[in-house]
Amino acid sequence: MDAQLEWASSLVPKRQLQQQQQQQEQQQQQQQDFHKDQLMTVGMRIRQRVDQGYASRTPSTSDASLQPGVIRDYSSVIVPQFTRSPLPTANSLPPMLINQRTMSTEASSLEKWDVAEPAAEHETMVNGSKRRL
């Protein structure tokens, strides 16, 4: 009977230890979930701050700069009366690049390099004379 009491009394601390471990694991899981949620919403929070015009209060900002929704447009100051020029239409061909020695009819092609004779594959020209390989 003493062995049974001793065994029963040893179970109580083990159960308490298991419960404490489970509680700690649950707390760690909740913290991990919280951090994952924070990371998943970073992009949304950044866009929200940009939309608000950086109206968050930081120690280095003054009260005058904390007007919500104010985004200053400096485009007219940087480039006064800026207008976008239209792009050329793609209906016409681009101009030919012509040099003194090149013409559009003399474009490089593989026909110049084709070998007329099958036996010529094994011959090469060295100093004007044919040599077999």
UniProtKB/Swiss-Prot annotation:
PANTHER family, sorted: DAMAGE-REGULATED IMPORT FACILITATOR 1 (PTHR28081:SF1), DAMAGE-REGULATED IMPORT FACILITATOR 1-RELATED (PTHR28081)
Q: Where is the composition biased (Basic and acidic residues)?
A: 109-124
Q: Name one GO cellular component term.
A: nucleus
Q: What does this protein do?
A: Mediates the nuclear localization of RNR2 and RNR4, 2 subunits of the ribonucleotide reductase.
Q: How does it assemble?
A: Interacts with RNR2 and RNR4.
Q: What does the UniProt keyword field contain? A: Cytoplasm, Nucleus, Phosphoprotein
Q: What is this protein called?
A: Damage-regulated import facilitator 1
Gene designation: DIF1
Q: Where in the cell is it found?
A: Cytoplasm; Nucleus
Q: Name one GO biological process term.
A: protein localization
Biased region (Low complexity) positions are 16-32
* Induction annotation: During S phase of cell cycle.
Segments for region (Disordered): 1-40, 109-133
Q: How is it modified after translation?
A: Phosphorylated by DUN1 in response to DNA damage which leads to its degradation.
- Does the keyword section mention Cytoplasm? yes
Q: Which organism is this protein's natural source?
A: Saccharomyces cerevisiae (strain ATCC 204508 / S288c)
Q: Name one GO molecular function term.
A: ribonucleoside-diphosphate reductase inhibitor activity
Q: Its family?
A: Belongs to the DIF1/spd1 family.
